[in-house]
């Protein structure tokens, strides 16, 4: 097993050296050239999928704290019905992951984004116009299905379309746009939450959730198809043309950068069975290095969920109430501050990841996160101490910042 891992590591190191030499010969487009701007626009269109996910978490967290929403549906901040409303979205995301496994290989990477965001728009409108709790929950289910389908494909598409030398930054930016959506929603709800007696206070944010999805639906088919999908479906010349247009500074179809990327695509496609058998997971566990990478990816996903970030996002107003903050306006304001802190952390992470490396950033951020969580536990361990509670809330912002850098 160790020999296989060593061989894989040597091959990866050799490939990195070849890529570094290729990038020295052809560094790609400048950021503000037309092709560079085109890459930015493609990325922003794809990142609408991430922004929608951020909007949803923040919108539900915010409206769950609004008296207008609670009285209309007869809900409480943390009752069983509230758990169903939050949980049904997660179930929808799980359902949406199944078409996300099939559609990208059958119809291309853009199709699941288009389909998923259409479903999301229907779900958002259904939730925003709901007059019964069941209708509202149904809208939440559709929103989750759309999100699960679109978001999964968006990440793989982005990693396959952006230049290799800035891939870490762009994928990090994808995660950062989650917090842009979160910040937009929480900032808006600070204002709408003050509309006493007006049902638009909670309905308007749900409508706004459909905006990024609508942008993606309108423009995603103006973006080029993934070169990996084109190659896997016998359209090798088109795959080379896309790589040359976006990754070569001279639009050279036989640039050393393009040649290396075509070799990588050919190698993975031949190993994975033409990239078409979505049910075949043997490529994930075929060799020791494959199992090592798969295990690492699974563990990062588990750690991301167990960090508590999702739970804190949804139930932050409840946690603030337990810390002694009862004002609806102050809860919404602190939720907005939480979103700003998250965005700052995500931007820092995306900016430094290509310089510090994935592993160093992961281990360093995890260590700091453990220390800060320990401090928060100590500060919030005593009931009735307002000073300790306020200090705990302050340190929780640092926890959010570091979690955003990490994940």
Protein language model regions, located:
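Cytosol/matrix-facing amphipathic helices and coiled-coil assembly/linker segments
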Residues: 257-274
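Short intracellular "coupling" helices and adjacent cytoplasmic loop segments at the cytosolic face
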Residues: 246-260
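Alpha-helical transmembrane bundle of multi-pass membrane proteins
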Residues: 1-247, 270-407
